[in-house]
Each structure stands twice: as C-alpha cells, then as structure tokens.
Amino acid sequence: MALKERLGTVVSDKMDKTVVVAVVNRFPHSIYQKTVSRTTRYKAHDEENNCKVGDRVRITETRPLSATKRWSVAEVLRTTKQEKEAVK
C-alpha cells in the first residue's frame, strides 16, 4: 500500500515537534460545476522543529503518533524566508 502524500502550508508551529498544516482541496461542485475550495488541517510530526508558519511542506501518512497526529513532515519545499526573497 502506497503512503498518502499532501502538499500544504504550515499555519501553526506552537506545539513541540508538531505543526498544523492546511491543505487546500479544489474540486468542481457536483451540480453547478463551480470550483469549490475546501481546507483540511492536519497535525504533522516535525522531529527537529524546522518548520515555521508560512512554510510550504510535503507531509506523508504514518502510523498514529498521538490521538490526533497521523502525518509526518517529509520535506520543507519552500520556507517563508525564500518566499520573501522571491517577491523582491
């Protein structure tokens, strides 16, 4: 069985070794065909506390690590610092 992966943005890093990642899912409405966006928040394990708010990350499914934590940060795709430099 392949592990599920999601791409998202870190919205909270206030917990120790845990970040909250918001993943946006876009799909057409079943009747009106308008594109609808749904945001799901996942708690993900961050062993070294590397992630900061605003970072783009890839998370992968893992065994249950706590009551609500079933995802782990696989890699940081883009940091907040890199995004600020790209805008300039």
Swiss-Prot record:
Subunit comment: Part of the 30S ribosomal subunit.
Family: Belongs to the universal ribosomal protein uS17 family.
Function: One of the primary rRNA binding proteins, it binds specifically to the 5'-end of 16S ribosomal RNA.
PROSITE patterns: RIBOSOMAL_S17 (PS00056)
CDD domains in UniProt: Ribosomal_uS17
GO molecular function: rRNA binding; structural constituent of ribosome
Protein name: Small ribosomal subunit protein uS17
Database matches in HAMAP family: Ribosomal_uS17_B (MF_01345_B)
SUPFAM superfamilies documented for this protein: Nucleic acid-binding proteins
Residue ranges of the TM segments: none
UniProt signal peptide: none
Keyword Methyltransferase: no
Key words of the record: Ribonucleoprotein, Ribosomal protein, RNA-binding, rRNA-binding
Domain of life: Bacteria
Alphabetized Pfam families for the sequence: Ribosomal_S17
Disulfide-linked positions: none
Alphabetical GO biological process terms: translation
GO cellular component, one term: cytosolic small ribosomal subunit
PANTHER family given in the database record: 40S RIBOSOMAL PROTEIN S11 FAMILY MEMBER, SMALL RIBOSOMAL SUBUNIT PROTEIN US17M
Organism: Prochlorococcus marinus (strain SARG / CCMP1375 / SS120)
